[in-house]
């Protein structure tokens, strides 16, 4: 280890290794031979026992056991009588003992962890090794005789053993007793060795020749990093099987792209043989003509793999295609990688990794078997005497006693040379005893005592109660206390009230010192006495000590950084801590019995840091989004709102003019003017109209700020505070906040606002609205009864009607309140002074929804499943609920409480994973100098802009110059920080994309650089080096999750359905532009959109895009392209409840495979008696045999076929439909008998373009809350595959859709003749199901119809082919039935576009579109979940987590690196290795990025200490010890665990050199009241 330490330790790295038996003996101070602990009479430790003083040290300080030597002067002496060394009893916490085991024992971690390390190394299954270790089976080693040596070496699964002379490859067999007796027991052949138990395993492990093993395995996996460039004779000879597969891949590609080799037939060669012989340089290829020659024929004749490439590109050029040879290279590589994923190769790679681990680390395999067992120091497994003569002991002592007892018994049996079977049994029991000690319950049943499993060594490490999480990461500290909090409105913002008795206890040592200094006490003892008596001098000293000494307050749960802040204590009477009301929001504290903890920072550095960094006045802004956290709330907001309210006409003092604040305030106090009167006031040189209340508010504003002349509610107040912070800085803002608090409280008190039941005004129109709604629902029921709409539609429409009614009542209620007047205190007030209204509108308490429930109507309630209960609650709380209504509403209320309990845990666990994955990301340097960046654009969802560009680039550093797109002038330069002004300017210039620097593209070696991170949002300046941005990111994402889950029950389950959007309106004036709009005109002359990705934009006169709206398929367009529109014009509307299948051409209709009770069912509604024909397959088999479709046949005989997905409802008039019995050829054929079905047939029916053929009802409306959202966040961060994945196109190209089936049947209904055609896997079917074809028409490229007839296809689904004529690339996708296709024949798609519905799989996006698109996708998806909840989190926090998910790469070709093919390594490690190989000159490794979920990323971090303390402790430690992993102690977690300063904040190396010189007392006294220092 290097001696240069980190923090307080003389080392900078920690390496984990396996301990050899000699290591264990060297740690030990003696062997423990007896299981005894303490003597029951003398209570002294027994000699040679588990607590032996001779081995572990004296029980009393500086005193031997027999008492002969006592006192410090004998230190180091060993007593002759009892053999105990005289020293401090502390050594009993650090001295080890050991137990010499009578027989070797397998360490269970290396036997039972998955995959088993010993099993992997010996190439045996875990179960086999276990059977050997527990004496159930024999391990037989088969050595080769001389003839077999070479054969054994080549065979897979053999193992090299070195007996000290030579290395032989042997086979291992695990056989049971019977087989052993039969085959090997009496064999005189010398080639077999055998044994049982850990002994034989140890023997084999100690002989393994790691070098030879590694060499063989490397040879085995070497071909799997081959590419086209490596093909040649050597490869052909060495790796026959793989090579043949690759030749076939090349041949297939040549055929597919029409590249022919000529002259093969005369020479009797197949294409594969020719390619093979060209690659191995046995044949020549004329690259001009394509002739294959036996001899060299001059310049044009080439041989080897290059010949194929040159010829291929020449041919493609003649065909006017782009000559892409990359495609063949890619296919070869894909074929190789497919082989890698084979189990055999994966296994070889796993063994190789383990062998390399042992080689590199210097561990020996036989050390996984224990000969000596260490005994941990006795003070770490204490035995405590309780009163009543009983003892409480650690479980470990019991486990050790079992081991010692069994070990001693085994020794005795071996000395007595007992029968083999007894010894074997005893050895097995010893093995089990050691297993229980190391990891109880890992194998078989755990050892129990009084029905409770004993805690083994592993249990002391793992889980929440283990050493890592309980004692190392979550220590309890002294100088702390906790108490209930109460509000302290008279405090200043940097103060808190600390109870005197509490302060006295916390500051005791300081008080003692002060008492001595002032001469009140002569000694510490005296001072103690004074403090106990609590004399007046004590309180005097306490006051002095506490002054200027900050304390930290913390409220659990500590969800983010502002949950711990520093305050200056003010001593108060009583026992409750007083908290300033403004700092409640960051703590999320209220005063209904919350408790808080107090901590005292002791050191001078700690006090300074508390003052400068943690003081509450320094934490006004949130690190998550940069908006103020410290906010006036409740009464303060109400008071401010009340006094800045609009003027009331006709009040006392109206029209008076004032010139100064003092005049107004005096007039107000004397009652000459009413607070809401309209007065004139002089601001600067201008006169303005305002009210005395607003003048009063402006009198507390910082100087030089513009006059605020508006009604201030919570939102405006927040905006005002943000603007002030920008304008006047921290200190002035804090002072202002304190003044707002005072004034707000005062004014709300003087206003005397209170609420009475009369303030809840039930709107007069409520009855009318409800009558109308009831009428509408009745109509909907009638339509349903008549069968015009389906049950699902009925449900959706009813929900919609009630949502609208609820909103209407609520709107009416607020309007009535606003327009009414009331007499209060003899004065007339407008309705906006209604106290409840004021509370809601100002944002002081409650919201419109809650008032709606109090005085409007409660509205719709949600069920557990998230659906709405159809019957709304019509009453409100003022009128009271009926029994039924009360019963319905218990539903939602209970759901709220149940959710809260479950989801808090879920969100907490998510936060923990996020912290663990990002904990080691800190700001490590000022600027990494990268030129890369991340493109920011507005987030648009469903056609509306959810997050504007200016919000996304705010606080970021530009990656390149930003130019005005119209004038070309440079608005901002690279590396400039974007503040509000600049963001606004960029947005105004109409720029749509801006490249900013991002943690995702940062090139800092460890962590992130300050420029790529941008602003520290809580300080509004570039982040300082050392900031722990990873943890801040995790907290910023996790905290709202926890908050949101806690928020559901406040509305009491009264759900609000999101109003369904059924049209789009313009927001601005301009000219209409269509994007991808394809429309047809229907019978009514309306334009119907039939494009799947259409959008309508509005441009201004310069042609700049102002807005863009997506338009769904089937929408009615209400404007024309190029039309001028005003703001508020409707552009398009559609039916929000259904998706339509629309006839795009006119013609006759034919139904195909629409068979009653087979492919469609008649849904007859019990209530309505009407029927609807709905597509649904009765049996899964039917879906294979039939494909329901509607065909429209035009006059010129062209067919347009529309597939009907499941749940589609036919839209054909009932009188045009008849049922006919017909023979079904497909079913008859599959059941091998004649089967008839009832087919639906359409009588003469012509459709016009735009007619609706069928409709698919949409999913029902559900309540969307983050609870639905949190699992989505988890799905994204864990990189899980979504439940319904979308199929994405991998290339750009045109879509072709074919049926996918094994056979095509042509059936002639007139003659009854049937012909079958078997279809090969790679053939494309050129006809559609149900189509009528003529004899001679092609069915596939090779098969032709032999009869006229109708086509029948037993379809599995579709083959969707994307073909790119330019590159010649083609990809095919299988789409199963029931998945909805988003593309049509002939559509053009881009790589990464979805072909079917569903959620895109992140890994697919990474593979197809690359890392940048994936980053954009993840960022947008996860932001949307939070945005739907109205939660603001800055992008950079998500970016840091996404950076961690993408920090690994998978090695495709190891080159000359130390990596293996398929291994996943950190980008950093790969970079280091590349640099090394560049210096030495060798083949560089190639890798591809992989996406890793946060749990896996946290477990595979380079720091084993951090991973072990996260999850799966056993596995992490086992892996780390075998590989001899080194922890560099870079992250925060590992440093906390070993007790070091963390490498963040002031713990960064840069600050190491800074020393704090304790100033004289005098200087300390003059410290300023509130913190004015800026962060250094």
Swiss-Prot record:
Necessary cofactors: Mg(2+); Zn(2+)
UniProt-listed Gene3D superfamilies: 1.10.132.30, 1.10.150.390, 1.10.1790.20, 1.10.40.90, 2.40.40.20, 2.40.50.100, RNA polymerase II, clamp domain, RNA polymerase Rpb1, domain 3
Highest taxon, organism lineage: Bacteria
Reaction equations catalysed: RNA(n) + a ribonucleoside 5'-triphosphate = RNA(n+1) + diphosphate
A GO term for molecular function: DNA binding
Binding positions (Zn(2+) 1): 64, 66, 79, 82
Residue positions binding Mg(2+): 590, 592, 594
Enzyme Commission designation: 2.7.7.6
Primary role: DNA-dependent RNA polymerase catalyzes the transcription of DNA into RNA using the four ribonucleoside triphosphates as substrates.
Quaternary structure and interacting proteins, as annotated: The RNAP catalytic core consists of 2 alpha, 1 beta, 1 beta' and 1 omega subunit. When a sigma factor is associated with the core the holoenzyme is formed, which can initiate transcription.
Similarity annotation: Belongs to the RNA polymerase beta' chain family.
NCBIfam families documented for this protein: rpoC_TIGR
Protein name: DNA-directed RNA polymerase subunit beta'
Highest classification ranks of the organism: Bacteria, Pseudomonadati, Aquificota, Aquificia, Aquificales
